[in-house]
Swiss-Prot record:
Species the sequence originates in: Microcystis aeruginosa (strain NIES-843 / IAM M-2473)
Name of the featured protein: Ribonuclease HII
GO annotation, biological process: DNA replication, removal of RNA primer; mismatch repair
InterPro entries tied to this protein: RNase_HII, RNase_HII/HIII, RNase_HII/HIII_dom, RNaseH-like_sf, RNaseH_sf
Top-level EC class: hydrolase
Amino acid sequence: MSAEPLIAGVDEVGRGALFGPVVAAVVVTVPSGFARLWELGVKDSKQLSPQKRQKLSRQIQRDFVCRIGYATVKEIDRLNIFHASLLAMSRAIGKLPLSPSLCWVDGKHIIKDLSIPQKAVIQGDQQSPVIAAASIVAKVWRDDLITRWHRRYPDYGLARHKGYGTAQHLEAIGNYGLTSQHRLSFSPCQPRLEHDCRTICPRVIEIS
């Protein structure tokens, strides 16, 4: 058995989207495994083509311990996106079949009530191969999920923008309304929510 410490990297995707859950992935390796990740071509998922991300995600999940966690739209609206993102990360780590010696968390904040040592790494998906690997796995998993939702809501163009607030998406919200997977607490969804409430919800008239 290797005497090297187990290092986990965790990252989330979908924080800025208007539709769907926020998704986190954790990837675990030993320090000598970093070279393998660099060799595969791991980098920040936003810098990779969808085809390259798909290929890398399969390779990462084949060669390393990985887990996924997410927070639902209802949890995002109830907790706010910051706390929901940390919840998704915590859930991913909680599914691990082993206990890492250290967890590197992308961003400025560590995860509350996590029993293992943590280090927050600003722009971690650009600094750490294990965090970058987690960003790739999370991105591919979430994109696949949103593409499946596209089959249920084809008018919103979800397969193209993956739930983010593009002009096409905002126009579709204006035309067709909000779905069960839209984040009602996000400001771009508010005008349509207020419109629907005025249209559907009866006004309460106070009689003096």
